């Protein structure tokens, strides 16, 4: 009977405990440092989800509490209110927050190629069937309804693409669309095309019959590397924990780069309604590189900030250098060089 087996097991355990010699010194488990981290449901966060599930943070003594949020706009608000210690989101919400005096600090990248400037390879424009926008022909966006998440990376991305072909935002109709609703907007013809970050372009391609890619990346005036952001207050209170967090995140990135299909499967447990096929497609060529470089600052100054000014999302240009702190990535590179071994070395002249 189950009761008898359970009793016998308990009795055996008690007997073993009585007969076992007591340890010379009682072992106590070291308390873990709690870190509250907000992330979006973006494919670029696969390394983070992998690091959480594979225990990379806990092995470093961190108790990471995860907050899922729709976009960087909500994460910035959470950082500003002090309800989270760190956040993973896009360049444009980060720079907008800095321009408004929010005390946020960039301490690493999520999706990124430290050797590239400009870069927009996490973003794509996807069209529905019969949208009238041939692949590669951005001029045909004129007069179309474009689904974007207002205030997030897709909006300045589409603005940059339009500028490249002599169009402006006045030539199109922007439809404010939540990331998870992008495919639905195409299917219901609420939008002719969508401009979004992965995995939402891949989700549209796999879920909406007849949908196709108009352009992948391709913005010549965009610098939109994913950002790992904290606050000045968190740095003052939890600098060591943040150092360990960046180390664990870098290790998660290294694992995800080597195991993209498995990282995609892990991400399905964190991104509602997303399947492994879609996430595998989204992660296939996504650059994952936590390192900061001079390309970060140059990209912000040359492309990201001027674009935000031109779109009247920030009042004026500013120098972002004071809001970029490389010490945490530098510490991670020193602590575990193997987590960076598969990445191309940053040229000496481009290092921070």
Predicted regions and their residues:
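Positively charged n-region of N-terminal signal peptides that target proteins for export
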Residues: 1-5
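Short, glycine-/small- and polar/acidic-enriched structural segments
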Residues: 27-168, 173-176, 192, 198, ...
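Bacterial N-terminal signal peptides
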Residues: 8-20
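Catalytic cores of transferase enzymes with a strong primary signal for eukaryotic protein kinases
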Residues: 107-116, 123, 128, 134, ...
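Secondary-structure end/capping motifs
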Residues: 236-317
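Pocket-lining segment of extracytoplasmic ligand-binding domains
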Residues: 92, 129, 171-175, 180-272
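Conserved C-terminal helix/tail region of periplasmic/extracytoplasmic solute-binding proteins
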Residues: 309-352
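Sec/Tat signal peptide C-region and signal peptidase I cleavage site
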Residues: 20-26
């Amino acid at each position: 009977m189950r009761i008898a087996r359970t009793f016998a097991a308990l009795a055996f355990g008690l007997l073993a405990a009585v007969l076992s010699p007591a340890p010379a010194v009682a072992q106590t488990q070291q308390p873990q440092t709690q870190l509250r981290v907000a992330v979006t449901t973006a494919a670029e966060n696969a390394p983070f989800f992998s690091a959480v599930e594979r225990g990379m943070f806990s092995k470093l003594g961190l108790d990471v509490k995860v907050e899922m949020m729709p976009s960087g706009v909500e994460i910035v608000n959470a950082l500003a209110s002090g309800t989270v210690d760190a956040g993973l989101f896009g360049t444009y919400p980060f720079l907008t927050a800095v321009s408004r005096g929010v005390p946020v600090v960039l301490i690493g990248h999520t999706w990124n190629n430290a050797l590239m400037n400009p870069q927009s390879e996490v973003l794509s424009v996807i069209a529905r069937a019969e949208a009238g926008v041939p692949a590669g022909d951005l001029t045909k966006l004129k007069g179309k309804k474009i689904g974007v998440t207002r205030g997030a990376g897709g909006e300045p991305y589409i603005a940059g693409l339009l500028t490249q072909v002599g169009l402006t935002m006045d030539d199109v109709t922007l439809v404010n669309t939540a990331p998870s609703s992008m495919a639905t907007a195409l299917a219901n013809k609420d939008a002719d095309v969508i401009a979004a970050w992965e995995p939402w372009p891949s989700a549209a391609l796999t879920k909406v019959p007849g949908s196709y890619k108009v352009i992948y990346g391709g913005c010549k005036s965009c610098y939109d590397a994913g950002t790992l952001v904290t606050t000045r207050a968190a740095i003052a209170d939890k600098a060591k924990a943040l150092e360990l967090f960046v180390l664990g995140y870098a290790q998660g990135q290294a694992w995800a780069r080597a195991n993209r299909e498995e990282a995609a499967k892990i991400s399905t447990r964190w991104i509602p309604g997303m399947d492994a096929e879609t996430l595998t497609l989204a992660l296939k060529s996504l650059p994952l590189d936590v390192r900061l470089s001079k390309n970060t600052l140059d990209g912000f100054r040359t492309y990201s900030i001027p674009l935000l000014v031109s779109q009247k999302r920030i009042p004026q240009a500013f120098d972002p250098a004071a809001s970029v702190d490389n010490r945490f990535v530098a510490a991670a590179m020193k602590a575990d060089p193997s987590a960076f071994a598969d990445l191309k070395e940053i040229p000496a002249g481009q290092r921070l």
